[in-house]
Amino acid sequence: YENDEEYESGIDEKKQEKAALAQPTLDTADDGFSFTPASSTQSTPSISTLSDTISHDGQTSDPITKAVRETIIQPQKDEIAEQILKDLAALVDRDLAEQKRKEIEEEKEKNKTLSAFFGNPANRELIDKALEKPELKKKLEAIEIAGLKNVFLTYIAANGYSGGFKPVQWENQISASDLRATVVKNDAGDELCTLNETTVKTKPFTVAKQDGTQVQINSYREIDFPIKLDKADGSMHLSMVALKADGTKPSKDKAVYFTAHYEEGPNGKPQLKEISSPKPLKFAGDGPDAVAYIEHGGEIYTLAVTRGKYKEMMKEVELHQGQSVDLSQTIAKDLTKVQGRSQETLQPIITPNQELKSSIETPTTTQVPPITPDSQPLQTETAQMPQSQQVNPNLLNAATALSGSMQDLLNYVNAGLTKEKDGNTQIDLINAAATAILNNEKEKQANIIVLTENTVNNNALTPDTKVAGVNAVLENIKNNQNTPDLEKSKMLEATVAIALNSENLAPKQKQQMLEKAVDVGLNLKDDTSRAVAIDGITDTVIKSNLSTKDKGTMLIAVGDKVNASELSNAEKQQLLGSVLKKGVETQVLSPEQQQLMQQHLDKITAEQTKNAKITEVQGILANPAFNTIAKTEAIQNVTTKVLDSPIKAEIKGETLESITKVVAESPLNGQDKVDIVKGMGEAIASHKTMSPTEKISAIESVETGVAESITALEDKKLMTKGLVDGIYEDKANPEMTKAVSRGVDKSTARPEDKQALKDAASEVALDRETQNFTKGLKEQNLEKPKPRDDIYNKAQDVAEALKNVITPVLDAHPEKREVSEEEVMKKTSSILNDISNLTIEKVNNFRAMLSPDSNLKTLEEKKAEATKKVDELVKEFGTKSSTEEQQSFIKANLTDDKTLSKEVRLQTIDKLLQEQAQKRAKAIENPNVKTEDVRVVSEQSELKPISNDEPGIEKTKMVVGRDRVNIKDNIKIIGALMNARDSIIQSENLP
């Protein structure tokens, strides 16, 4: 790259400016892009700046998106939230301040992203007020710069990161216009998308900086960031540098960027998931073409995105549940002079208007013969338009043509479609025509139908371009604010009818158009309008000339779109139920298709049930009129309802797990939580109709909820014990108590926490088995059993004693029914048999618990194992001769090894500390004592003759030894041990 001064002096000013944009200096910031192939297993680089902030929760597959979220987006949200809390403290309306404070704090606990708070329009005033603070702006700017710097340095192709950021290679400007493009490709050469960049030359307008200084904007650029990507699979990131007020790129050390993050979606295609840009982003006007700008380092920079494109991108981010939120501001009051764009900024994607006129006069081969419009648009009109009303030249030409007649508009469109072979250019023409029709109050519906038919039947278009063209028309219908929803519904029905009944489209293209129409229908303003639209589309499918099989396929596509939408479960259930009903009544859906759609309905119903039960439990816990007993009984009833519901076992388990988490994470005190979980265990164990297998599965789910809840370990242990206690309130099954341990194993709890929870479960199970065994014997009058080998024989003594009591009683009451001694003995024997059976059952329970599979050990056994392990670790430590080896041993075995219990690690550390202290004491007492078992040179060693008998011999040897302890190294080891102990104790205190 070269500087401007190095270009030949003959280059005129305009060419020099374009060359400067195309050929940045080495110091100049550049646009970049990154692409990671689908399901890439490339590991995230280890960098110190990101290692402490990027979590390992696995929620984000793409490392760049994850890094941006956790080092830029979320920290910026947190800083804004902190400033809002400061502002609330000074708010006069204390009720409102307290309400908003609670809203922020509660959402922080539930969802640390704060997306709901920032996405709530009611909070916008608070957010804008916070963004006015200069100190906050500095913090946000610092976060943006530091975060992007680390991301770019880490994920850069030049540093060996596969698919990392590399410069965008813009092609030369197209003809004499200020339009240039680039085809973005991955490392394999596959095309990802085509980016078009337009340099906009404006009559100067000014914007105000924060200090009131006016800055003149002479030039900026627009880039048509893609909304959908459907070519190559994977994740892509487009990072475009912001331009200075004069339209040139800044140096790298002052650069800021507008970055679009496209993350691999469920189908493998990149989806627009996040947008990262400086905060706050402002727009110079309220029109869709208003340019974005920011103040950075006291300077004004323009970003390569317009207000319309930004809003469209943010809607896509919201659709894919990204964490970015729209914090942009429309700053019309900052504009001191806003002129329309000059003539050269309106770059037709096809040709200039003069060329367009000649093309219209040329006969075409399309079905509609061309008719020259009565008048062509004037260039001067374009230059006089206010900026807020700027449109692209195609739209202006289309609107002018439509002012004559719809036939004139078709002539204009068809002439362009025939002349231009590029699909994107053809789509832009169709899109402009649709916009012109919808902006005209006359005959919208009829003209949209004509345009759609013309698009579907136009031989100048490829099948894929036809799909894209019709979808562009549908997107225009969706975004048009001046068309009532009822009229939009009729347009959707007509579009679907044209597509499905066309002989020029394959089934695949027909389905793509249908799916887009359904998407538009699902985005109408209210549920009534959406229902009318989907019902109309369904009826259109049924009435079409497709085969019954193809009709069924299309209805399934409608159902899939409804099922995948972001609507509430209740509305999805209504819409899907209507499609299914119509498909069954008209015999369009096959039995298999009916079953598939019914499965979707069942899943929605199950989700509704799950959410309803969770909401019900939340209401019970929050009800101030309920004491602990009432809450326990109410949640037991909810548990029973879940167990009795017809939903699948998987959903039942998820529901029970969610309910348990709600209880465990509630603000109730620990004992109240224990009582409620105990009640849930009792409700499951005592259920009358559930099979043992179903009960076991339910118990596992409850314990998984306990183990995964965000609460203190001690509370989890108490709730686990409570669950086992609840099981034992009914007749306990050993497999049911083992289910508690399996629930722990299935959870995502930490390994050391899992063992603690399983130990708690085993402890209470053993205690309850002992209690039940004693209780069972006491109930049969065997409070103090004699030491006999056979309990049955022992109990016969009781039977003999009974005879001496029964006979006198019967003699004294002859009116009673006589009972033979034989009958009495039979009855007594039956009772004793019951006692024996009870005893055998309890013994078997003990055997099951004490079997090798149960992992149940006595306290003495555990202590012995721990002592043995401590001795082994101390002995192994003694084999490490160097300080470095000893430090590595401490880190690997005592700090990082979570498979060892906390007690074993702490005992080992204590024992090693004692040894180090003893060695140090000996060294201080006898500093000159040496050992000669290791050949290490010591400062205290000395040369001695080989033989005392021949002192003249000069040949000597070095008697080498080592000090008993090197004081400096001893201090290092003691420090490492104490750090390890602190780390273990601190990790125990984490929630």
Swiss-Prot record:
Residues 1-63, 738-789 are annotated as: Disordered. The keyword Chaperone does not apply. Residues 743-789 have a biased composition (Basic and acidic residues). It is found in: Cytoplasm. One of its GO terms (cellular component) is cytoplasm. InterPro entries: Rickettsia_antigen_120kDa. Residues 36-63 have a biased composition (Polar residues). Keywords: Cytoplasm. It holds the Pfam family 120_Rick_ant. It comes from the Bacteria. Residues 1-10 have a biased composition (Acidic residues). NCBIfam families: Sca4_fam. This is Antigenic heat-stable 120 kDa protein. It comes from Rickettsia australis. The lineage of its organism: Bacteria, Pseudomonadati, Pseudomonadota, Alphaproteobacteria, Rickettsiales.
